[in-house]
């Protein structure tokens, strides 16, 4: 009898750690705050001593550092980004280390409307270290990056180099034609 029940026992689903629902709530709350442009609410999901490495390789330390970065990029007099959207996907459940530390990673689909009028869509990768402090999960470290060899900024630079090259070629042909005509007229 025990032999017959072994396959049933092997198929029993693993019990998921309740921490994962708490972490999903953090993710959903943070995404909602980002969608609404609520910087102060975004900061409430970050540890006071958070370290964030942004896509442009800038590093912000602490909630104040993150606030300054976001204000400068999104709201300041010299802001760079007019509008921002992001959809975050987690690759798998957070790897938990004990009951108060976790590491999560995944991808995000980003859309930026820049102040220059350019819109940029790209996929990024991210990783985060999360800690549970006073019963609440917080992001202690966040790192975001994009593909160095295949990204929209590189594509725009490549396109611009083709345009500039074409304009220079046409200008060179026109200048050569004009100089050639001048020499003929001088004879």
Predicted regions located by residue number:
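A mature extracytoplasmic/lumenal domain signature
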Residues: 46, 56, 106-108, 126-128, ...
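Short, low-complexity N-terminal intrinsically disordered segments enriched in polar/charged residues
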Residues: 10-40, 44, 157-165, 169-187
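N-terminal signal peptide c-region/cleavage motif recognized by signal peptidases
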Residues: 5-7
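Short, well-ordered alpha-helical segments enriched in acidic and aromatic residues
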Residues: 36-54, 61
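Short beta-strand edge/turn micro-motifs at domain boundaries
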Residues: 11, 123-154
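Surface-exposed, charged secondary-structure patches
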Residues: 55, 64-118
